[in-house]
Design a protein with these regions (language model features):
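Juxtamembrane/disordered regions of integral membrane proteins
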Residues: 2-299
Length: 299
């Protein structure tokens, strides 16, 4: 992660993307949606869930994490989001946030549908889903408007592939990502049974099978959608080192903010961090396999 951030700020071709005006826009991107969605979250929870006051997870550390996560997501637009091939800069900013919504947030949150227990009950509710979807839409609109005049061209040539080839590579990516999740769970459970996904989330024994079926389906879905970033942002004929750096960027800006937040809903902090690190390696493997798949289909 340090290598990625250092490379971003040290590169001469990137310096014009991080002037004071851009940093100010990032701060506004963090501030404006949070000023609206935090009161909205309390209101929706009260109306839909019938709860009084703020939800239990809305604490000062949670708000601080949310601000830091949004800053990371905003930074991600300056690193990979601006590369999306959409001419209208407002729509480009909106599309960047929506792509995070469908490729990261939706699979992560819905992957818990098959489980039960207090942690899942707290983190997966109609109120949370409603507010989060509204929040993502608002963030996309705010980012697009703030970056309306930010039209930096992608310096890298992108691989042009047919839809058929892309679908095949995406299915391979999806199957591999789901399999890596499954194998990671088995490996963790072999060391200590309390390290399994179901144990960390407090899923009852009766719901374990259903939990893993649903979880695997949505991890496959995530694996099918994540290659959209590869298609539009991964440089053509990227080297292994460039592909690894790209995987680190996808992990940091797209995937991890929606994984690490679970620590605020009750998952053990160190185990949550450990799975976050594991996901970095999973995404790294998937990006390298995707790169190889594209190369093979070009032969």
């Amino acid at each position: 992660m340090t290598l990625t951030v250092s490379r971003i700020f040290d590169s001469e071709k990137n310096k014009d993307r991080f002037d004071s005006c851009v940093i100010l826009r990032l701060l506004l991107f963090v501030l404006i949606p949070n000023l609206i969605t935090t009161p909205l979250r309390i209101f929706v929870e009260a109306v839909i869930e019938g709860k009084e006051g703020a939800p239990a997870f809305v604490t000062v550390p949670f708000i601080i994490y949310g601000i830091c996560a949004e800053l990371v997501v905003g930074l991600g637009y300056l690193v990979i989001g601006y590369k999306l091939p959409i001419k209208n800069t407002v729509l480009r900013g909106f599309a960047y946030i929506m792509l995070i919504l469908i490729s990261s947030y939706i699979p992560n949150i819905l992957a818990m549908l098959g489980g039960d227990g207090k942690i899942i009950e707290e983190s997966l509710s109609m109120g949370i889903l409603v507010v989060d979807v509204i929040s993502y839409s608002l963030k996309g609109l705010v980012l697009g408007l703030l970056m309306k005049n930010y039209d930096v061209k992608n310096p890298d040539e992108i691989e042009q592939i047919t839809n058929t080839r892309f679908i095949i590579c995406s299915i391979i990516y999806g199957a591999l990502f789901a399999a890596l999740n499954f194998l990671t769970d088995i490996a963790a459970g072999a060391i200590n049974s309390s390290w399994r996904f179901c144990s960390i989330l407090g899923v009852s024994t009766e719901r374990e099978n259903l939990f893993y079926i649903v979880f695997t389906i949505f991890m496959f879905m995530a694996g099918v959608l994540l290659p959209l970033w590869n298609r539009y942002c991964l440089p053509k004929k990227a080297s292994i080192s460039a592909s690894i750096i790209f995987a680190l960027e996808i992990s940091l800006f797209v995937w991890l903010p929606n994984v690490l937040i679970m620590a605020f809903f009750g998952t053990p902090f160190m185990l949550t961090m450990a799975y976050g690190i594991a996901y970095v390696f999973m995404i790294m493997i998937c990006v390298l396999v995707y790169r190889s798949s594209i190369s093979l289909t070009n032969m």
